[in-house]
Regions:
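Short, well-ordered beta-to-alpha junction loops that form the rim of enzyme active sites
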Residues: 24, 112-113, 164, 210-212
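Non-heme Fe(II)-dependent double-stranded beta-helix
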Residues: 2-15, 22-128, 174, 243, ...
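A structural signal for short, well-ordered beta-strand segments
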Residues: 113, 145-147, 228-232
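Active-site rim elements
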Residues: 81-86, 190-196, 216-217
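Glycine-rich nucleotide phosphate-binding loop and flanking beta-alpha elements
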Residues: 27, 134, 214
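Non-heme Fe(II)/2-oxoglutarate
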Residues: 43, 47-51, 62-65, 158-161, ...
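Short hydrophobic-aromatic micro-motifs
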Residues: 21, 145-147, 206-208
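Catalytic core of non-heme Fe(II) oxygenases with the double-stranded beta-helix
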Residues: 95-98, 122-197, 237-245
Length: 253
C-alpha cells in the first residue's frame, strides 16, 4: 500500500465507518493461518468459546444439545501461535494505525484477539451491534481489523455494515438490554435497510470503527469460515481501570 492509498483508505473509513483493503495478505500466508486454525480447532485447544455459550440465534441450546461443542472463537489469538501474533503486529498494520490515530498504536488483548470460526448448521447469526457496547476506554475511538482467511460472502455468513453509523448519536432506547440494535423499531429498520455486505476474497482486510453498526448472518455453505480479528487503539486512549478492557496487558508495537 502506498502512503497515498492509505490516506484514501483512512478518509473512506472516517466517512463510512469501514473500509476494505483488498489483497493485504498473500494467499500463501492465509493458507498457513488457516492450517494452524484448523489444527487448533480439531484439538479444541483452549481457550475457546462455544456457540452454546452465547446463545445467539441459531446456536445450540446447550453443550449437550446436537452441535453443542461447535466452536465460535479460538480466543487469545495473539498468544495462540506466533503466526497470529506476527500478523497482529505486522509493519503494514502499525503504519496504518499510526496514520489513523496520529500516535503510537496499541493492540488490545482483551477484545476480539481471536480466530472467528463460523460453522455450517450450528454457526449462529449475530445481531446488529456496535463493538464498543462492552468496551471501556477513555474515548470511543478503537479500530478492528478483520482478515478474511478465506472468501467471505453472504452465503457463508459475511459481515454487514451500516454506512456512516459510527457517527450517529443513537439513544439508548434504540438498543435492547443486551445492547443489540432493535429490529422492531421503524427508525432502526430504516438504518438497517442501508446496510451493505462487502464480498471479501482471501487476504482482504476490513478496517472498521468500534461504533459502526454491523451484523453477520449464518453460514449456509458446507465449509467452516475463518476470520482473524484484532482491535487497536491509540496509546493515549487507555482502558478504564477495573474494567474488562483493562483485564489483560496490551501490546505495544
Amino acid at each position: 500500500m502506498s502512503l497515498h492509498s492509505k490516506k484514501e483508505q483512512i478518509q473512506t473509513l472516517r466517512e463510512q465507518g469501514f473500509v476494505v483493503v483488498p489483497g493485504l495478505v498473500s494467499p500463501e500466508r492465509c493458507d498457513e493461518l488457516k492450517r494452524i486454525a484448523q489444527r487448533q480447532l480439531q484439538e479444541a485447544a483452549a481457550p475457546i468459546e462455544f456457540e452454546a455459550d452465547l446463545q445467539y440465534p441459531g446456536a445450540p441450546s446447550s453443550k449437550d444439545a446436537p452441535g453443542g461443542h461447535t466452536v465460535r472463537r479460538l480466543l487469545d489469538a495473539y498468544g495462540r501461535h506466533p503466526a497470529f501474533a506476527q500478523w497482529a503486529t505486522a509493519p503494514e498494520i502499525r503504519g496504518w494505525m499510526e496514520l489513523y490515530f496520529g500516535e503510537e498504536p496499541r493492540l488490545s488483548r482483551a477484545h476480539h484477539n481471536c480466530m472467528m470460526t463460523k460453522h455450517p448448521a450450528y454457526g449462529s447469526l449475530t445481531g446488529w451491534h456496535r463493538d464498543v457496547r462492552y468496551w471501556s476506554f477513555e474515548r470511543d475511538d478503537l479500530m478492528s481489523v478483520w482478515l478474511a482467511v478465506g472468501p467471505e460472502t453472504v452465503d457463508n455468513g459475511a459481515l454487514w455494515f451500516v454506512p456512516q453509523s459510527h457517527g450517529a448519536a443513537f439513544t439508548s432506547d434504540r438498543f435492547d438490554e443486551a445492547k443489540f440494535f432493535r429490529t422492531d423499531l421503524a427508525e432502526n429498520d430504516a438504518a438497517i435497510r442501508t446496510a451493505v455486505s462487502p464480498e471479501l476474497k482471501t487476504g482482504d482486510v476490513v478496517f472498521f470503527h468500534c461504533n459502526t453498526l454491523h451484523s453477520a448472518g449464518k453460514n449456509l455453505s458446507d465449509q467452516v469460515k475463518f476470520s482473524l480479528v484484532f482491535t487497536y487503539h491509540g496509546a493515549s486512549n487507555v482502558p478504564l481501570p477495573g474494567t474488562r478492557s483493562a483485564a489483560k496487558p496490551e501490546i505495544a508495537f
